[in-house]
UniProtKB/Swiss-Prot annotation:
Residues covered by region (Hexokinase large subdomain): 209-454
Chain's gene name: HXK
Family membership: Belongs to the hexokinase family.
Positions of the UniProt region annotated as Glucose-binding: 151-177
Quaternary structure and partners: Monomer.
Summary of the function given for this chain in its UniProt record: Catalyzes the phosphorylation of hexose, such as D-glucose and D-fructose, to hexose 6-phosphate (D-glucose 6-phosphate and D-fructose 6-phosphate, respectively). Mediates the initial step of glycolysis by catalyzing phosphorylation of D-glucose to D-glucose 6-phosphate.
Enzyme kind, highest EC tier: transferase
Name of the protein in its database record: Hexokinase
GO MF term list: ATP binding; D-glucose binding; fructokinase activity; glucokinase activity; mannokinase activity
Length: 478
């Protein structure tokens, strides 16, 4: 059996002595399918680099590589009061960020629940609601008033095209929103008009993507940070490139911007390998793709993001039942329901601390109505390990590709998201994957994944501060 990454303590895993030979044979085949060798990781990384380059070209590619129009590095010395908002699927988050100027900041925040009808409301109602929430927040936090307009950074996690940091044309609503009169329009002046109508002393100076916010917030507090990452229900990465390396910017930036100027890039690399050239897809991955709302899209995301981990496990278990190898004479109706096993299920399976895997037993009884045997639970545990390990190892190919592309020999890669933060063993498996790609000889890894700062709040505020400084210095925003 091939074991990659950290091994669970032996007393938790138990032995496979009671597992029938026919099941062990099947498990060995599945280990071969789901195990990603160091050599394969290196090949994927090389292909990843070429797709990153293609995304920056005039012709474009699978990976969008969207310029974020943040053209300065945070120094950590930025100071002042800044506001940030994040429009999520169910809440509006308003954050006051006080930048301390010594790579430090304090935040105060409030959440406002979106009214039930807001997702399908009229455009004016959405902006009026946000302006009203901002007014309440400012009146509460600045009871003596403010001397000048508060700069605001707007985290807008919906597909938008930008030609500068202070504009964003909504391409299409996602996350269940369907508000008329917004798609195809610049959201910044719409929000600004609603704010001015209420005479709230706020100026919207920056519209940002959440992963770009994670990058900038982490660079503010950590001078070694080179990348912002997200690993949760989706996956993404952001980093700084230079204008000269981005052919598709030709003719879109003023002549007085130096070719060596930095430019934040929001990769959206969940779309890596949409052409299915390099990723080691199994028949289970192919089935997930074919039955998804957008077949052929987000190939990388479908193999590594938390949204799909439980579904891979479900499909493998269904396959084993079709061969009459497990769950004999059981009611499988619930197991046949797509996505009935969310990301928490393989995570909880891996976390079961008991040698007899009694937590797994209860889990399958509770969620699927299936009684499991001891050998079946051991197979289920091993499958969860393999799926989690594959996700972690594949996910770092994006990190490795960006580091190689930019020539980073050392880097802190700041990661956020539920899979990174909560999935058992993910950090250790990802670190092992990076070692397998770079084959370092040093005792300490020069490129490491670290917890990210709050990109939705602090990141948006710091970008607002950088934008405000550019305006004061008379520098162009495009």
């Amino acid at each position: 059996m091939v074991h990659l990454g950290p091994k669970p303590p032996q007393h938790r895993k138990g032995s496979f002595l009671d597992v029938p030979e026919y099941l062990l044979k099947e498990l060995t085949e599945l280990e071969g399918l789901l195990t990603v060798s160091g050599e394969t990781l290196r090949k994927i990384t090389d292909h990843f680099i070429s797709e990153l380059e293609k995304g920056l070209s005039k012709q474009g590619g699978n990976i969008p590589m969207i310029p974020g129009w943040v053209m300065d590095f945070p120094t950590g010395k930025e100071m002042g009061d800044y506001l940030a908002i994040d429009l999520g699927g169910t809440n509006l988050r308003v954050v006051l960020v006080k930048l301390g100027g010594n790579r430090d900041f304090d935040t105060t925040q409030s959440k406002f629940a979106l009214p039930e009808n807001m997702r399908t409301a009229k455009s004016e109602e959405l902006w009026e609601f946000i302006a009203e929430c901002l007014q309440k927040f400012v009146e509460e936090e600045f009871r003596n008033g403010v001397l000048s307009n508060l700069p605001l950074g707007f985290t807008f996690s919906y597909p938008a095209s930008q030609g500068s940091i202070n504009e964003g044309y909504l391409q299409r609503w996602t996350k269940g929103f369907d508000i008329e009169g917004v798609e195809g329009h610049d959201v910044v002046p719409m929000l600004q008009a609603a704010i001015e109508k209420r005479k709230v002393p706020i100026e919207v100076v920056a519209l940002i993507n959440d992963t770009t916010g994670t990058l900038v917030a982490s660079m503010y507090t950590d001078p070694e940070a080179k990348m912002g990452l997200f690993s949760g229900t989706g996956c993404n990465g952001a980093y700084y490139d230079v204008v000269d390396n981005i052919p598709k910017l030709e003719g879109k930036v003023p002549d007085d911007i130096k070719s060596s100027s930095p430019m934040a890039i929001n990769c959206e690399y969940g779309a890596f390998d949409n052409e299915h050239i390099i990723l080691p897809r199994t028949k289970y991955d192919i089935q997930i793709d074919e039955e998804s709302p957008r077949p052929g899209q987000q190939a990388f995301e479908k193999m590594i993001s938390g949204y799909y981990l439980g579904e891979v496990l479900r499909l493998i278990l269904l396959d084993l039942t079709s061969k009459q190898l497990i769950f004999k004479d059981q009611d499988l109706s619930k197991l046949q329901v797509p996505f009935i096993l969310d990301t928490s299920i393989p995570a909880r399976i891996e976390e079961d601390p008991f040698e007899n895997l009694s937590d797994v037993q209860e889990l399958f009884q509770e969620i699927l109505g299936i009684q499991t045997t001891s050998p079946e639970r051991k197979i289920i545990r091993r499958l969860a390990e393999l799926i989690g390990e594959r996700s972690a190892r594949l996910s770092i190919c994006g990190i490795a590709a960006i580091c190689k592309k930019r020539g980073y020999k050392t880097a802190h890669c700041a990661a956020d998201g539920s899979v990174y933060n909560k999935y058992p063993g993910f950090k250790e498996r990802a670190a092992k994957g990076l070692r397998d790609i770079f084959q370092w000889e040093s005792e300490e890894d020069p490129i490491v994944i670290v917890p990210a700062e709050d990109g939705l709040g602090a990141g948006a505020a710091i970008i607002a501060a950088l934008t405000e400084k550019r305006l004061k210095d008379g520098l162009p925003l495009v």
